[in-house]
Amino acid sequence: MNVVVTTEAHFDRTPDGRVWTSGSFSYPFWTRYLAAFDSVRVLARVRDIPVPPPGFRLVNGPKVTFAGVPDYRGLKQYMLRLASIVGATAKAVQNTDAMVLRVPGQLGTQIKWHLHKSGRPYAVEVVGDPYDVFAPGAVRHPLRLFFRWWSPRNLRQQCAATCAAAYVTRCALQRRYPPGPGAFATHCSDVELPPAAFVNAPRISTPNGPGRLIFVGSLAQLYKAPDVLIDAVGNCLREGLNIGLVLVGSGRYQLEVEARARALRFDGAVQFRGELTSPEAVRAELDQADLFVLPSRVEGLPRAMIEAMARALPCLGSTVGGIPELIPEEDLVPPGDAPALARKIREVITDPVRMARMSARNLSKAGEYSDAELASRRKAFYQHLRARTEAWLERKR
């Protein structure tokens, strides 16, 4: 049996038909579905390019193909290309056996309309919370208030009608978007943590020189609150704390965030690495840091934080989404509160005993998200969808 999986990620396609990404969704990510299915077809936005940029990784390959949707960004482009998008999604539903919708997202919503007409069972992978996505400060859009009302309502309906639901959180997203009666439900993060992702032991050394903070996240939106972090670092520097900050990530807000950093007038205190396209490069940056900070306004379960924990890195985060499932209350701050974050940074970076304790706890916690630990839960989820789809197809014959 084959499976089609929708995703809101963007991909690039070269004239030879190969599909590329700079993000997490390269070929190994999609092969996880082969634990229960014979092949995978990814339904996603695809842009045609002449050659792949340096560092991009291949997405399609043996048993993993693409059903491309015309690339669009934002509501205006979506409406302009709606006819082509509807045609592509309708074709995907007609030509497949099983369906997995990675939600929230417009493609998942579009597919759900087709599935409702046919009665075909489907599964959802809930990877984020649209209520937080459209919170004040997280996104700038004239229809933000409408989408903050409509999008959670739509996601609740999708989850209520599914035959199987997998959430990236243990309980945070489940409380707001519960599965329907009789649905199979589980939790499993998207993170990929092979043995090479883990260090062997917690950190015991104290920082030599400036305490080095690190942020890893997309700058396509301000969901991860890099602006709040820069303001907090500025507060710390003005109070005489000897720290620096490295930001890993890129996107449309990068220039704005860089300007905010320059406005601090502490030359060299904030450095930008851009997007790092290999896990090894990200791990190298994490290993040079003393404290990982992710003060997100919006979050499902942050893969970047789990990856930092696997390197035994002490972590601070906000109270949103699934972050409280990863780190204790004493390491959390309210979202959007730069003064509170500055106080927490000072509190932690000046306490080597606490940092050593955080390091050991985080490394142990990351072990719960290793590839070996998550594989069995994913397989049970896929197998349930396959069984339900096979039963539906049998009734249709």
Language-model segments: residues:
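Short alpha-helical donor nucleotide-sugar binding micro-motif in glycosyltransferases
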Residues: 93, 275, 284-289
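Donor nucleotide-sugar binding/catalytic pocket of nucleotide-sugar-dependent glycosyltransferases
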Residues: 144-212
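A conserved mid-protein helix/loop that constitutes part of the nucleotide-sugar donor-binding site
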Residues: 211, 215-235, 245, 252-258, ...
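Nucleotide-activated donor-binding/catalytic signature segment of Leloir-type glycosyltransferases, i.e.
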Residues: 258-276
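Aromatic "clamp/platform" in nucleotide-sugar-dependent glycosyltransferases that forms part
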Residues: 297
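Short hydrophobic beta-strand element within catalytic cores of glycosyltransferases
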Residues: 314-317
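Conserved acidic donor-binding segment of nucleotide-sugar-dependent glycosyltransferases
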Residues: 330-338, 347-352
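C-terminal alpha-helical cap of glycosyltransferases
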Residues: 364, 371-397
